[in-house]
A protein has these predicted regions:
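A generic structural signal for short beta-strands and their flanking turns/coil linkers
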Residues: 12, 25-27, 36-38, 58, ...
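Hydrophobic beta-strand-centered segment that forms part of the acyl-chain substrate-binding groove
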Residues: 67-101, 106
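C-terminal binding/interaction regions
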Residues: 107, 112-114, 124-133
Length: 138
């Protein structure tokens, strides 16, 4: 896997909840390229729990949305905004896990709409969450 350099790091005013490294409230995702996929390895934190030791579903949705936007950035060399997101929560994610892995890839491009699929895996490699996003690329 090859690390993707964040092109906005150091830009004045850059404070993305998903990927800004200096946003104290944010999730601070980093990304890697692995063939057709973009990958993120992320450490759950207790402040992002919903129920005791369980990663909040809204935070999972943020992670999925962010990685899909980075797929558009990396693979199409443009930015995109989410127009639709369908998410299935299959298994809870433990906030005590050492890490989780997210993987996403483009499934289809229709004019200015990009369909991206993403999966979130727990530390044991089990699929916990699946999303399909439609993003409008700019």
């Amino acid at each position: 896997m090859k690390k993707i350099i964040n092109p906005w790091k150091g830009l004045e005013g850059y404070n993305c909840f998903g990927c800004a490294p200096n946003n104290e409230a944010g999730v601070k995702m980093e990304f890697y390229e692995d063939g057709d996929e973009v990958v993120s390895i992320w450490k759950p934190r207790p402040e992002y729990q919903g129920w005791i030791d369980t990663l909040h579903g809204g935070i999972q949705a943020v992670l999925m949305d962010e990685i899909c936007a980075w797929v558009v950035l990396r693979k199409l060399q443009t930015t995109g905004v989410t127009s639709k997101m369908e998410t299935r929560y299959r298994k809870s994610v433990d906030t005590k896990d050492s890490h989780i892995v997210l993987r996403a890839s483009i499934k289809e491009v229709k004019r200015n709409i990009v369909i991206v699929e993403a999966k979130l895996y727990n530390k044991d490699g089990e699929v916990c969450t699946e999303s399909v996003l439609s993003l409008i690329h700019i």
